[in-house]
């Protein structure tokens, strides 16, 4: 419905038929929403990222999904933290590729050569702004399991993480 008066203005009225959701429907929706937010509850991730801001953002987003996150600032620190950790401490490593001291490719290669098979086989997901097919291939050749592009898109990262748990 439209009402209009020259020099005064117009009024538009729209009627949208709908029904009120039952209490059961709204409760079910709340439970689904709540379980989605904690979809990675209890997962401990070793985040290897040299950029403080990127690390802070990734940590916050992962914590919102229910993860516990430890951070390594470069590949050397990542390898060292994994070697010193008890088996099963980390379920997955998120690895930046371009870092000082030791890059992500070299760190992944060192991890895959560890004597402890449980640590050597930990899932490693490359996180990098380089999203070309050759970058993905380089990550796989270094022993990483998968590749996600930055900036982080949780609609991509969460299912990728789930795939390896």
Question: What are the residue ranges of the model-derived segments?
Answer:
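C-terminal compact regulatory domains
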Residues: 1-165
């Amino acid at each position: 419905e439209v009402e209009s008066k020259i020099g005064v203005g117009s009024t538009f009225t729209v009627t949208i038929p709908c029904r009120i959701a039952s209490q059961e429907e709204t409760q079910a929706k709340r439970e689904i929403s709540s379980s989605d937010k904690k979809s990675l509850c209890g997962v401990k991730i070793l985040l290897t990222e040299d950029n403080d801001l990127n690390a802070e953002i990734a940590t916050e987003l992962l914590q919102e999904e229910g993860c516990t996150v430890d951070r390594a600032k470069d590949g050397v620190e990542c390898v060292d933290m994994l070697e010193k950790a008890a088996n099963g401490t980390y379920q997955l490593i998120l690895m930046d590729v371009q870092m000082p001291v030791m890059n992500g490719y070299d760190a992944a290669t060192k991890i895959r050569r560890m004597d402890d098979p449980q640590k050597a086989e930990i899932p490693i997901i490359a996180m990098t702004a380089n999203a070309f097919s050759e970058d993905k291939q380089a990550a796989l050749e270094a022993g990483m399991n998968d590749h996600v592009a930055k900036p982080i898109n949780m609609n991509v990262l969460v299912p990728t993480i789930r795939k390896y748990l």
